[in-house]
Design a protein with these regions (language model features):
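TPR alpha-solenoid repeat register
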Residues: 69, 103, 157, 192, ...
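Terminal, low-structured helical/coil segments at or just beyond the last alpha-helical repeat
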Residues: 191, 199-242
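N-terminal leader/linker segments that initiate helical-solenoid repeat arrays
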Residues: 20-76, 80
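Canonical tetratricopeptide repeat
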Residues: 72, 106, 160, 195, ...
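Canonical positions in the second alpha-helix
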Residues: 59, 93, 146-147, 181-182, ...
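Short coil/linker segments at helix-helix boundaries
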Residues: 34, 84, 109-142, 167
């Protein structure tokens, strides 16, 4: 009986290692056939995506690799300020990794930039460009919110949506909880303090705005910011006592 069991386990082990060897051989043959191993340049990444997308049904693991390459390619385009191409790469990467908060954040960043590059090239009137701009801004908003829903403490997305609400939508009240949460961990970020103080001022929360400007002055990030904080504080105090 022991000999039979021993023979059985040996047989199973042979099948397991043979399967692993076969799988690795397929991977090696695929790379040799397609000429894709470890792409690094934009051109190599684009070529790898094209080739592996066609063969994705061959090996399920290639799906994850394609998603990673889309993210890498997107960051390369983002570094070169090619926001449209970068955004498409990140959107494609989301299809492979729908629970990755970073990818939604990058989509939001690109959409925000694209909103400010939208011009009426086709001569359809200003309304056409305005609609496209708003669509990009809504995409940015939804992407930030999705990133935050995945990771509620994702401070970059918290700051991003705060800026979006204050400077793009003029919805300062919506920005406040996100910026407050951001500053609960990023205690010395004076840029966020300026944005939140502006939101407080716009919603008539003058004392909170003054308190933030005092904090900026106390932190002394640089002479220019201190001077701006002092000027803004005076403006708030003037409005408060009118």
């Amino acid at each position: 009986m022991k000999k039979i069991l021993k023979s059985f386990f040996v047989f199973c082990a042979m099948i397991f290692f043979a399967s692993c060897s076969s799988y690795n051989s397929v991977k090696r043959m695929q790379r040799m056939e397609e000429g894709v191993a470890n792409p690094t340049t934009k051109e190599e990444l684009e070529e790898a995506i094209k080739k592996y997308e066609k063969r994705a049904m061959d090996l399920a693991l290639t799906d994850g690799q394609v998603g990673i390459w889309y993210k890498i390619l997107g960051t390369r385009y983002l570094d070169q300020r090619l926001y449209g191409k970068a955004m498409e790469c990140f959107k494609n990467a989301v299809a492979y990794y729908p629970d990755n908060a970073n990818l939604y954040y990058y989509v939001a960043i690109c959409a925000g930039y694209m909103a400010h590059t939208e011009l009426d090239y086709e001569g359809n009137g200003a309304s056409s460009a305005a609609i496209k701009k708003m669509n990009y801004l809504k995409l940015a908003e939804n992407s930030y919110l999705q990133a935050i829903s995945i990771n509620p403490n994702y401070y970059r997305a918290l700051y991003g949506i705060g800026v979006l609400y204050v400077f793009e939508f003029g919805e300062d009240e919506k920005a406040i909880p996100y910026l407050e949460k951001f500053l609960s961990t990023q205690l010395k970020d004076t840029d966020a303090m300026f944005v939140l103080a502006r939101a407080y001022y716009s919603t008539y929360q003058y004392e909170k705005a003054v308190s933030l400007y005092d904090k900026i002055i106390e932190l002394k990030p640089n002479a220019e910011k201190v001077q701006e904080a002092q000027a803004n504080k005076s403006k708030v105090l003037e409005a408060q006592y009118q």
